[in-house]
């Protein structure tokens, strides 16, 4: 007996959320949940509007942005932590989804913080 498509889609999302930092493929998820790759991708996209692996990549990029803004962890280590196959792949995907390479993203964020703090200190002096 096949479960309702929306129930399956939510099971897939829970699985992806729990394993998004690991190397993961659509085939692995489909085998784990005992459905075809095509059906899994179809019901997931129908429910959430994006293909499952794009969902995973967006989760990873969101977490990477957090690491880049809030830590000084090297980019290669962030890529590894988030399950990227290589630093080159991570850089390419980060740029694809944000429009900026990770190093430049971090640098721009730090400059905006410095500029913001400088502006606040100038306001206090007035």
Go through each PLM region and give its residues.
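An amphipathic alpha-helical interaction segment
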Residues: 1-15, 32-41
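Terminal helix-turn-helix DNA-binding modules in bacterial transcription factors
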Residues: 10-14, 18, 23-27, 46-91, ...
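Short glycine/proline-enriched turn or capping motifs at secondary-structure junctions
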Residues: 88, 98-100
């Amino acid at each position: 007996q096949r479960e309702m498509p929306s129930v399956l889609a939510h099971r897939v999302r829970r699985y992806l959320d729990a394993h998004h930092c690991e190397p993961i493929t659509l085939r692995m998820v489909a085998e784990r949940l005992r459905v075809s790759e095509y059906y899994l991708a179809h019901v997931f996209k129908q429910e959430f509007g994006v293909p499952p692996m794009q969902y995973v990549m967006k989760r990873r990029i969101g977490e990477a942005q957090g690491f880049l803004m809030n830590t000084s962890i090297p980019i290669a280590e962030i890529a590894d932590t988030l399950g990227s196959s290589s630093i080159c792949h991570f850089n390419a995907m980060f740029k694809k989804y944000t429009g900026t390479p990770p190093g430049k993203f971090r640098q721009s964020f730090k400059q905006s913080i410095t500029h913001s703090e400088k502006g606040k200190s100038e306001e206090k002096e007035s």
